[in-house]
């Protein structure tokens, strides 16, 4: 078997500006020697994270390694193909080790976020996960996300953390997804077996041919190989997010990332973030019912791109729940209720009726709880 070609085969290219990103780190980097977690490669990645946070950007880490860490604590246990219960036990043992590894690199709090398939399939839990991640970023913490292998069952698993990283990137409206691998980027074939493999430093449009190039190889100790990384790039690209594949074992490559230089593969999105988001908002099913707003609120939404606040609400129709897609209407000379916009509502119909016309600061007093100042946030709203 031949060695991996050096990173210099990939020309250096600039990384466009971004303000929010996800970094995915796999087991092959955190447990490279098969003997549990090691800071060997994680330290360089931590420097990349710190440099960007210091510059005012926001980052979420999606990190594998819990099962590998657990396996090192109680050897020998079945490999990754073993019983589900054994794997879940290993994840429970190793997750604390994984968070401790990341915390040692940072002088800011590291937040553990464990997600399951149901958290992302159920709209309300999806919104709660998004709100939690956004708040953690707002507080200046570093969220470290992993799939909750301790409770996930095979038929409801997200499958791999490449896929999870793409979902999280869309969840937080990221502009970039960085996937650290144990290979330099995408090649025309596996460079570990074919010395004539050619590097692909930029992919404008991912095709079935690219997936075929990646094959079905998987990295040692994990569940995802290059094919799953390309599938994640497809998912991220559908949300307007750039994906960057790079060698996380190369200090030079990782240091270059901190200076917005990539030696690896850039995979372009299939649409812009705005187009992807607005398309989903415009075409998702709408629940029965609507919120009627006054002329001032209508002007703020239509002309200023504002969020919908309770002060501009006149009434709520129907029995919608928090997280539902609802219609926002206003009065016109010809119609008592004219469709203006649609969006994801932060409060139920019953709650909206109670806080209609009030100031946002009074929500807590009127309801006894609050989900924020807005009824429909501008990021969750599209004009018709």
Curated annotation (Swiss-Prot):
GO terms for biological process: L-proline biosynthetic process. Its EC number is 2.7.2.11. It catalyses: L-glutamate + ATP = L-glutamyl 5-phosphate + ADP. One of its GO terms (cellular component) is cytosol. GO terms for molecular function: ATP binding; glutamate 5-kinase activity; RNA binding. ATP binds at residues 24, 181-182, 223-229. Residues 288-370 form the PUA domain. Pathway: Amino-acid biosynthesis; L-proline biosynthesis; L-glutamate 5-semialdehyde from L-glutamate: step 1/2. Substrate binds at residues 64, 149, 161. Keywords: Amino-acid biosynthesis, ATP-binding, Cytoplasm, Kinase, Nucleotide-binding, Proline biosynthesis, Transferase. It is found in: Cytoplasm. Its main location: cytoplasm. Catalyzes the transfer of a phosphate group to glutamate to form L-glutamate 5-phosphate. Belongs to the glutamate 5-kinase family. This is Glutamate 5-kinase. The gene is proB.
């Amino acid at each position: 078997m031949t060695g991996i070609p050096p990173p210099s085969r990939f020309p250096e290219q600039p990384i466009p500006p971004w303000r929010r990103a996800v970094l995915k780190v796999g087991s092959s980097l955190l447990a490279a020697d098969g003997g549990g977690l090691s800071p060997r490669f994680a330290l360089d990645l931590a420097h990349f994270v710190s440099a960007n946070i210091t510059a005012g950007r926001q980052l979420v880490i999606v990190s594998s390694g819990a099962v590998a860490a657990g396996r090192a604590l109680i050897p020998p246990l079945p490999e990754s193909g073993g019983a589900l219960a054994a794997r879940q036990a290993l994840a429970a043992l190793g997750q604390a080790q994984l968070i401790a590894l990341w915390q040692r690199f940072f002088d800011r709090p590291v937040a553990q976020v464990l997600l399951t398939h149901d958290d992302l399939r159920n709209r309300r839990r999806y919104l709660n996960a998004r709100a939690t991640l956004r708040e953690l970023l707002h507080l200046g913490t570093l969220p470290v996300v992993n799939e909750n292998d301790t409770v996930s069952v095979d038929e409801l698993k997200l499958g791999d953390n490449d896929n999870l990283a793409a979902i999280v990137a869309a969840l937080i409206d990221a502009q970039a997804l960085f996937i650290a691998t144990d290979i330099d980027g995408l090649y025309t074939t596996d460079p570990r077996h074919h010395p004539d493999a050619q590097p692909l430093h930029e992919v404008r449009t991912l095709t079935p041919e690219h997936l075929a190039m990646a094959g079905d190889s998987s990295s040692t100790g994990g569940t995802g190989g290059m094919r799953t990384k390309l599938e994640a790039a497809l998912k991220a690209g559908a949300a307007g997010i750039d994906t960057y594949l790079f060698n996380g074992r190369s200090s030079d490559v990782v240091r270059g990332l901190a200076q917005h230089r990539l030696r690896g593969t850039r995979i372009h999105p299939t649409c812009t973030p705005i187009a992807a988001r607005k398309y989903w908002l415009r075409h998702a099913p709408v629940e029965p019912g609507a919120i009627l707003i006054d002329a001032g609120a209508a002007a703020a939404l239509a002309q200023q791109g504002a969020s919908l606040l309770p002060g501009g609400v006149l009434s709520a129709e129907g029995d919608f729940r928090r997280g539902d897609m609802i219609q926002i209407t206003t009065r016109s000379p010809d119609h008592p209720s004219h469709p203006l916009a649609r969006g994801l509502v932060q409060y139920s119909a019953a709650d909206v009726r109670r806080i209609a016309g009030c100031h946002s600061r009074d929500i807590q007093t009127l309801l006894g709880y609050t989900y924020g100042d807005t009824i429909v946030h501008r990021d969750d709203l599209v004009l018709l």
